[in-house]
Amino acid sequence: MNQLKIAVAGASGRMGHMLIETILEAQDATLTGALDIAASPAVGSDAAAFLGKPAGVLIESDFAKGLANSEFLIDFTRPEGTLQHLEYCAAHNIKMIIGTTGFDAAGKAAIAAAAEKTAIMFAPNMSVGVNVTMKLLEMAAKNFSEGYDIEIIEAHHRHKVDAPSGTAIKMGEVIAGALGKELNDVAVWAREGVTGARDPSSIGFATVRGGDIIGDHTVLFAGIGERIEISHKSSSRVSYAHGSLRAARFLADKKTGLYDMQDVLGLR
């Protein structure tokens, strides 16, 4: 069995730990590298030290050392860090699985450009459940296009730095697309003060931050006499890690190109 040679960015973080543990448990994957910022106290330590069973892979801040033996980099960090990793990976033919959120238009354009040089999986959420939910939302939006108000409510832990979440924005894009609209034309990102009556064509967003919430997303279709709620709630980051490995398997035979989890799951 050919082994997927995978490195993890943000190796000392919560998601980094989950990815490392999942890779070490997989039969078809090998942890071959680990990256973190130079200021991290974890640099120089074994990437699996937190498990009490060293993996023989040190956490590096130098890209050349951290990625020397890897075919894939899984990155759930921050946009500025991911874009640095992206430049290196594109230049050295290393495939990327990007779960980082919060990119601006320029960042997304850089990812698309890099995909002409290497294969990239870019998705705001790697969970299989979330991506099946996206398909359900597309179907629902087409059937609740008239007379229903659409609101997207998301909740995450206190440490999350971007809002709304990338998953919530993607849900909005899917719904808007199903209605033949652009999200930026209909989105109401926040409400405060005297806002007036609701625009029936709008898609509203509400954000909650607190505690250790992994990620909850609910889309409300509110009509007269009924309301429909489609929800996904994450209880562990392991679903993101399993989805990331599934993405790596999908990319294994790809040379270049930009993909997302809808491609992996055959939901196009």
Curated annotation (Swiss-Prot):
It catalyses: (S)-2,3,4,5-tetrahydrodipicolinate + NAD(+) + H2O = (2S,4S)-4-hydroxy-2,3,4,5-tetrahydrodipicolinate + NADH + H(+); (S)-2,3,4,5-tetrahydrodipicolinate + NADP(+) + H2O = (2S,4S)-4-hydroxy-2,3,4,5-tetrahydrodipicolinate + NADPH + H(+). It is an enzyme of class 1 (oxidoreductase). One of its GO terms (molecular function) is 4-hydroxy-tetrahydrodipicolinate reductase. Pfam families: DapB_C, DapB_N. It is found in: Cytoplasm. GO terms for biological process: diaminopimelate biosynthetic process; lysine biosynthetic process via diaminopimelate. Pathway: Amino-acid biosynthesis; L-lysine biosynthesis via DAP pathway; (S)-tetrahydrodipicolinate from L-aspartate: step 4/4. Gene3D superfamilies: Dihydrodipicolinate Reductase, domain 2 (3.30.360.10), NAD(P)-binding Rossmann-like Domain (3.40.50.720). It comes from the Bacteria. The keyword NAD applies. (S)-2,3,4,5-tetrahydrodipicolinate binds at H157, G166, T167. The keyword Oxidoreductase applies. The active site is at H156, K160. GO terms for cellular component: cytosol. NAD(+) binds at G10, A11, S12, G13, R14, M15, D36, G99, T100, T101, A123, P124, N125, M126. Its EC number is 1.17.1.8. Keywords: Amino-acid biosynthesis, Cytoplasm, Diaminopimelate biosynthesis, Lysine biosynthesis, NAD, NADP, Oxidoreductase. Its main location: cytoplasm. PROSITE patterns: DAPB. Belongs to the DapB family. Catalyzes the conversion of 4-hydroxy-tetrahydrodipicolinate (HTPA) to tetrahydrodipicolinate. This is 4-hydroxy-tetrahydrodipicolinate reductase. It comes from Janthinobacterium sp. (strain Marseille). The gene is dapB.
